[in-house]
C-alpha cells in the first residue's frame, strides 16, 4: 500500500533500441519493469527492433508470457530493414505517448539501477532533458570527436557520451517543432532551448562496457554527418584548403612575373601557360569557398522529411 502511495501519478514511456541484444534482454527487462513499477502508476515499454537476427524478440514475448501485466503496455516496432540507431529511436520516440520519455540506446546495464530514479527526480527540479553519461572506457577517437564538436558548435549545450536519458513531454514537442528529420538526437536535445543536464556515473565493469558498445562503422558515419550538420568544421577545412591553393597560385604568379622581369630564358609558351593556369585555379578555389558557404546556409535552411520506415507495430496484451 505504501509503495502504491509513493508512486508518481504520471504515465511514462520507455523506448529501447534492439539490434542483436538477446544476451542482455532478460536482465534489462527485470530491472526496468521493477524500477518503473516502483516509480510510476502506469508506463509503456516500446522496443524498436532494428532488423535483429537473434532471438531477442522471442525472449521479450517469453518474459511477458510469465509476467503479470497490470500497469504496463508493451509495443514492438519492427523496422523494415536495418536503419541505424538514430532513425530507429526517432521512430520509437514518435510512437511514445508518455508524460516523460526514457530513451535507452542499448540494453547493457553498467550503471546502478537507482540512476533511473535519480535522473527522473532531476527533471522535477526544472530540467526537461536529463541524461546519464559515462566517460569510463571512452575511446580516443570519441574524445577527439566530442572535443572538435563542442569547440566548433555554435550552441551553448555541450555533448558527451550518454547511456540513456529522459525527456519531458515539453521537450518532445519542442523537438518535433524544430524539424521532422533529427539526424543526431544528442545534439538536438542539448540545444533545443530547454534546460538540460547530464548526470555522470562510473561504469560497474569497464571491460564489459567496451565490448557492449558496437556499431563503430555506423558511429563513424554519424560523427561525420554531425560535424556537417551542427558545426562549421567542414566549412573551415574547405576554406583553409582553398586559401592554401590560392596562396600557391599567387606564388606561382609571382615567380612568373620575376622570370619575365629578369628575362630568364624559358621554354616558349611556358610563361603564358602557367600564368593562365595560376589565375584560373585561383578563381576556382575562391569560387569553391563561396559555394561551400552557400551550401552551408542551404543545409541549415533545408526542410528534411523523417527518414525511417517501419514494417509494423506489435502489441503484447495482458492475458485475460
Predicted feature locations:
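A conserved acidic beta->alpha catalytic loop
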Residues: 49-58, 108-109
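N-proximal low-complexity "stem/linker" segments adjacent to membrane-targeting elements
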Residues: 1-34
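Acidic helix N-cap motif at the loop->helix transition within catalytic regions
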Residues: 24-26, 54-63
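Short aromatic/hydrophobic "clamp" motif used to bind/position activated sugar donors
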Residues: 101
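Catalytic donor/gating beta->alpha subdomain of glycosyltransferases that bind UDP-sugars
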Residues: 173-233
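Glycine-rich, basic loop-to-helix element that forms the pyrophosphate-binding segment
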Residues: 78-96, 114-118
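Short beta-strand/loop segment that forms part of the nucleotide-sugar
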Residues: 41-52, 77-79
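Membrane-embedded multi-pass helical conduit in multi-pass membrane proteins
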Residues: 235-316
Amino acid at each position: 500500500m505504501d509503495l502504491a502511495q509513493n508512486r508518481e501519478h504520471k504515465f511514462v514511456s520507455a523506448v529501447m533500441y534492439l539490434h542483436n541484444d538477446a544476451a542482455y534482454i532478460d536482465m534489462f527487462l527485470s530491472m526496468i519493469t521493477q524500477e518503473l513499477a516502483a516509480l510510476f502508476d502506469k508506463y509503456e515499454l516500446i522496443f524498436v527492433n532494428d532488423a535483429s537476427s537473434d532471438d531477442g524478440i522471442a525472449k521479450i514475448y517469453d518474459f511477458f508470457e510469465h509476467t503479470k501485466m497490470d500497469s504496463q503496455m508493451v509495443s514492438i516496432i519492427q523496422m523494415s530493414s536495418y536503419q541505424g540507431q538514430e532513425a530507429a529511436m526517432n521512430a520509437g520516440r514518435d510512437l511514445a505517448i508518455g508524460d516523460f520519455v526514457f530513451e535507452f540506446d542499448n540494453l547493457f546495464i553498467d550503471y546502478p539501477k537507482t540512476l533511473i530514479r535519480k535522473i527522473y527526480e532531476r527533471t522535477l527540479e526544472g530540467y526537461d532533458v536529463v541524461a546519464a553519461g559515462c566517460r569510463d572506457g571512452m575511446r580516443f577517437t570519441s574524445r577527439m570527436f566530442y572535443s572538435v564538436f563542442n569547440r566548433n558548435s555554435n550552441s551553448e549545450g555541450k555533448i558527451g557520451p550518454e547511456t540513456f536519458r529522459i525527456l519531458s513531454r515539453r521537450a518532445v514537442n519542442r523537438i518535433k517543432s524544430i524539424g521532422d528529420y533529427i539526424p543526431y538526437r544528442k545534439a538536438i536535445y542539448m540545444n533545443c532551448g530547454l534546460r538540460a543536464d547530464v548526470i555522470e556515473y562510473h561504469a560497474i565493469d569497464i571491460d564489459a562496457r567496451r565490448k557492449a558498445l558496437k556499431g563503430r562503422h555506423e558511429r563513424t558515419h554519424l560523427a561525420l554527418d554531425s560535424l556537417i550538420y551542427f558545426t562549421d568544421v567542414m566549412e573551415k577545412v574547405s576554406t583553409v584548403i582553398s586559401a592554401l591553393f590560392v596562396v600557391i597560385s599567387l606564388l606561382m604568379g609571382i615567380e612568373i612575373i620575376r622570370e619575365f622581369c629578369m628575362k630568364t630564358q624559358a621554354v616558349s609558351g611556358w610563361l603564358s601557360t602557367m600564368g593562365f593556369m595560376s589565375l584560373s585555379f585561383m578563381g576556382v578555389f575562391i569560387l569553391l569557398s563561396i559555394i561551400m558557404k552557400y551550401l552551408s546556409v542551404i543545409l541549415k535552411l533545408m526542410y528534411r522529411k523523417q527518414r525511417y520506415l517501419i514494417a509494423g507495430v506489435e502489441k503484447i496484451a495482458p492475458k485475460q
